[in-house]
Amino acid sequence: VLAAVAVTTAFTATAEAATPGQVTAGSGWKLISPDSVTSLSPGTYTIQFDSTAARTKLTPYLKLSAANTAKLTPGVKFVVSTTLQKRVTTGCQKARTIVASLEYRPLGKKGYSQGGACYSLADHSLWSGYVRIDTEWFYPKWFSTNASTNTYRIRNSTTHEFGHAIGLGHPNKDLNHDGKVADYECPLNKDKSRPLMCSPNGGMVTSAGAGNYTPLDIPGLKALVANYQYR
């Protein structure tokens, strides 16, 4: 039996335990929910594409996302395939696949994209996932009038959605204690950057850092691996 969960992203801690031993949140990171994906099962997850357009446009970005994720998840690999696979719109994708689509305003709102995941009800490990990327991200100067910055932001944004597809959530928190959890309200890294998974966006806007998880994100990925032993 499977269950699905989705996280929507716009681009314009005390730890919790899901089951004994599992950690689902910490300073600057959290999983989507302690009741959804709590671990990654060892082996390979394959990234496929919903269309030739998605494959052409998203392959270089998702290769970066996959590589940057895999180096932080020992025993769990993410491989980008050339295979075309229609995204399942009701229910879950095939086991151990993450399907990427390129759509104009997939949620009907300017700049909104989405990442989502399915998990096994038996042990809450990741079953499959998807990313739906807004074509507007690739319009000239969409994120910035600076071409390099624009590219860096696309890298960060794609990895952000990929993070949702494997179980990472937004780590936003009411830091100023005003009773509201606001956009960009996330703990900061030592270099003052926001976690990559911060909503609506975060990450390092540099040539070397773009598309990478920040130091605050990394414990979340490590938790997804470590939690599997406590399933």
Indicate residue ranges for each PLM-predicted region.
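Bacterial N-terminal signal peptides
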Residues: V1-A10
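Disordered inhibitory propeptide/activation segment of secreted metzincin zinc metalloprotease zymogens
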Residues: F11-K57
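A short alpha-helix/helix-coil micro-patch that ends at or immediately precedes a cysteine
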Residues: I47-K86
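Surface-exposed patches in mature extracellular/periplasmic domains of secreted proteins
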Residues: L72-T90, H170-D178, R231
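Catalytic zinc-binding patch centered on the HExxH motif and its immediate surroundings
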Residues: T90-R132, A182-Y184
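Short pre-active-site segment immediately N-terminal to the catalytic Zn-binding motif
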Residues: E136-T158
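The catalytic-center signature of Zn2+-dependent metalloproteases
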Residues: Y152, N156-L216
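Short, low-complexity, Pro/Ser/Thr/Gly-rich segments in the mature regions of secreted, periplasmic
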Residues: N212-R231
